């Protein structure tokens, strides 16, 4: 008699479909019991048996694999790169409070803005400030369809495949009254025990350990291979929403609603009355900090009433209704064995203390920044000193104090360098700066290497595969002396490397060639202009539309742009005025490097005007409408404030329309918006 295989026993269509649905339900239920409720109902072996059964069914019947299947949590195929995602509403950062008086000042500002007398008690929601990576999840009709990192607050990276591997993130929401669209924000983190285990595994494998749990979480989520992420026991906690229609009246009710839908929220969140109640909650959390199973670096205080949150609104980078109360940095005592001089991409020579290793926040610290020579003189830091070090923000170790009473008299001062420790070029300060810089420019190997590494990096020209190892070899072989030389490389150049095959050389050349058509904002950022980060580069690209226009921009034109102050404008102008840089740009153009951008008109019809869109537009998508405004020099934001000039209301407009009317802001129909685009308001 022929023996039936396991596949044969589960391919009956109706039975297989019903069983797969039941297995998905059971696995998600047990996932939640284990990861959220900490109350497992079955053994690991029983869970694995259910999981394997579902895998077998899906292998036999691929048509039964659903987007919310728990089997997707093991990770899929590696990605070539992350795509960018623009958040519908900006993911703002929070203002910080380091002292209790600053926390009280937070309430005073709120009372002033709301014209609230002291007799009216404000309610707050207090929650731990997780030390992880901020992400946004998008659910449509209850199904997880997209996940992205915070990025710069406006644009992040899509990490959906990686987030699906985070065990306490529901792939499908449960419960009643699920919204058609839900954007939920939260923090992905690595529990402390898992962090220590991961670092032990990395050290055993000869890999460098992560500096802290936050870096481990961020590095994991930005892994291109979801299978690697799936092997790391990440977790997530939700703290707020972006786009969502809600009947909740308070932040506390909103978090309860998210929990009812199966989303993980903090079990440490508290609702308190008055700012003194919030301060007491902060003090209590600080005392209990070391007993928690995860790293936190403070507490977030939020006005609990959602209506008041809406009324308070946001500043350009942070909401007015929330503040992050930071814990004092943890400290330890150690000895400075040596002071090492490090040369960075822009030539800054930074003194770094080599320390006797000391344990700090669960991490072994052996180096600490000394910042600059003004700081060294101010603190009277010498080689051989006993010092107090702290992890500022619990991330970057720094020397904060010298224990003068521990001096023996043998300690040695470190003079300010007059020459570069690497290339020997003259080192000097520039007017108004504390930094000492090597004047060797690209003749200085660290500056050359770092400038090319930056140029090729993922956030800049994104030349896939061209990492620091290959760049250093290119420089040592004399094949690359500036960024333009990258576009002259040949297959034979790469074949000089050890263990370089034909296929890898072809891939590197293809990656370099494809970067010739990179976005203008990335190209501007890649040039490494001092003070020009990704956000400013994007603003410059939108404003000028081409590198030629930016090259010829005057100081007056530059300083008129948001995000560009006098120091940034001078830095931009100095960069483009330098003959060496002009030569490099000419060579890049000759090599076919032609950055692309949808041109944004300088002094366009809508220049200086700020728009907010709400509801559904009949003839335009939201992104298309945004591009039209920006192409005419206008700005689009996600929230209504007194600085908003126009609110464009489509069908099913929400609370933004009501707020606009309350503030007396002009509300436009879609037709009126189209006419404004055509005329710029000049009838």
Curated annotation (Swiss-Prot):
The gene is ligA. GO terms for biological process: DNA repair; DNA replication. NAD(+) binds at residues 44-48, 93-94, 127, 150, 187, 302, 326. Zn(2+) binds at residues 420, 423, 438, 444. Keywords: DNA damage, DNA repair, DNA replication, Ligase, Magnesium, Manganese, Metal-binding, NAD, Zinc. Its EC number is 6.5.1.2. It is an enzyme of class 6 (ligase). It comes from the Bacteria. NCBIfam families: dnlj (TIGR00575), PRK07956.1 (NF005932). This is DNA ligase. GO terms for molecular function: DNA binding; DNA ligase (NAD+) activity; metal ion binding. Its cofactor is Mg(2+); Mn(2+). Belongs to the NAD-dependent DNA ligase family. LigA subfamily. Residues 601-683 form the BRCT domain. DNA ligase that catalyzes the formation of phosphodiester linkages between 5'-phosphoryl and 3'-hydroxyl groups in double-stranded DNA using NAD as a coenzyme and as the energy source for the reaction. It is essential for DNA replication and repair of damaged DNA. It catalyses: NAD(+) + (deoxyribonucleotide)n-3'-hydroxyl + 5'-phospho-(deoxyribonucleotide)m = (deoxyribonucleotide)n+m + AMP + beta-nicotinamide D-nucleotide. CDD domains: LIGANc (cd00114). The active site is at 129 (n6-amp-lysine intermediate).
